[in-house]
């Protein structure tokens, strides 16, 4: 693995010289191995180690290099033609591969090659980008998008129209991470490497980026970039310092433990906010 990483790191430093017509075989093979690992779930852009999320920057570099090594080509899909550098994940799947994968793909859902879809995942008509990891039992509902390199945990529900942002550049930036058992309400957006910790609930229409204030009404504290475990979050606003206007924020209205979260319906948690 260290040899593979070194090839990718060195190639990224010299990426301006790479093209479909000019790239060493070792670089092509290394990039292909990384994309195949992402596709199979054996490699991940980010993984949790000792309770902390660690970003594998070299894997993001491999994804970026892959764009330089391929020309756009016609990609047929269901009677339509598309023109892109990255093939679709399921374009050459056999019935046996779908059975082995153990997930459902409802037309016209699209996942790109280099994304991982685990067992018991349901992809309603949705989109999953390269480098993304969607873990077991997760529902990606209609018109939801999972951006490049986003990490989605087990038993997550991404409701209709949810946008999970992608982060490829800058390389050092972390991806959006949605941990296990999180519910993200319809039309919500989580972008810019924000982390939603396990068992959290986001109501419909919550928008969170790195500059979004996350206000905890119990403590009065304001944080950025991370929603704590078990938090129930709704859209809200905070007054300006001069009191002349208000600006959008996300409001933590309560926190629940895993047991309460498992036993309580989403609507019940959100009522009375």
Swiss-Prot record:
GO terms for biological process: diaminopimelate biosynthetic process; lysine biosynthetic process via diaminopimelate. Pathway: Amino-acid biosynthesis; L-lysine biosynthesis via DAP pathway; LL-2,6-diaminopimelate from (S)-tetrahydrodipicolinate (succinylase route): step 1/3. InterPro entries: DapD_Trfase_Hexpep_rpt_fam (IPR005664), Hexapep (IPR001451), Hexapep_transf_CS (IPR018357), THP_succinylTrfase_dom1 (IPR023180), THP_succinylTrfase_N_sf (IPR037133), Trimer_LpxA-like_sf (IPR011004). Its EC number is 2.3.1.117. CDD domains: LbH_THP_succinylT (cd03350). GO terms for cellular component: cytoplasm. Homotrimer. Belongs to the transferase hexapeptide repeat family. This is 2,3,4,5-tetrahydropyridine-2,6-dicarboxylate N-succinyltransferase.
């Amino acid at each position: 693995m260290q040899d593979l990483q070194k090839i990718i790191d060195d190639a990224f430093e010299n990426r301006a010289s790479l093209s479909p017509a000019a790239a060493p075989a070792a670089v092509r093979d290394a990039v292909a191995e990384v994309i195949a690992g992402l596709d199979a779930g054996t490699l991940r852009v980010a993984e949790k180690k000792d309770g902390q999320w660690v970003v594998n920057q070299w894997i993001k570099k491999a994804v970026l290099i892959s764009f330089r090594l391929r020309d756009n080509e016609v990609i047929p899909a269901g009677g339509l033609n598309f023109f892109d550098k990255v093939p679709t994940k399921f374009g050459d799947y056999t019935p046996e591969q779908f059975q082995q994968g153990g997930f459902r793909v409802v037309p016209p859902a699209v996942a790109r090659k280099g994304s991982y879809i685990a067992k018991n995942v349901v992809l309603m008509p949705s989109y999953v980008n390269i480098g993304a990891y969607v873990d077991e039992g997760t529902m990606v509902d209609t018109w939801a998008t999972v951006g490049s390199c986003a990490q989605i945990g087990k038993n997550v529900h991404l409701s209709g129209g949810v946008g999970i942002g992608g982060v490829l550049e800058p390389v050092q930036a972390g991806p959006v991470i949605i941990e296990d058992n999180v519910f993200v309400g319809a039309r919500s957006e989580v972008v810019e490497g924000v982390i939603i910790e396990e068992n959290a609930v986001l109501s419909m229409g919550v928008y969170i980026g790195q500059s979004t204030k996350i206000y905890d009404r119990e403590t009065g504290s304001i944080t950025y970039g991370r929603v704590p475990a078990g938090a129930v979050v709704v859209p809200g606003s905070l007054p300006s310092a001069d009191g002349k206007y208000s600006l959008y924020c996300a409001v933590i209205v309560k926190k629940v433990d895993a047991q309460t979260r498992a036993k309580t319906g989403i609507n019940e948690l959100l009522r009375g906010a």
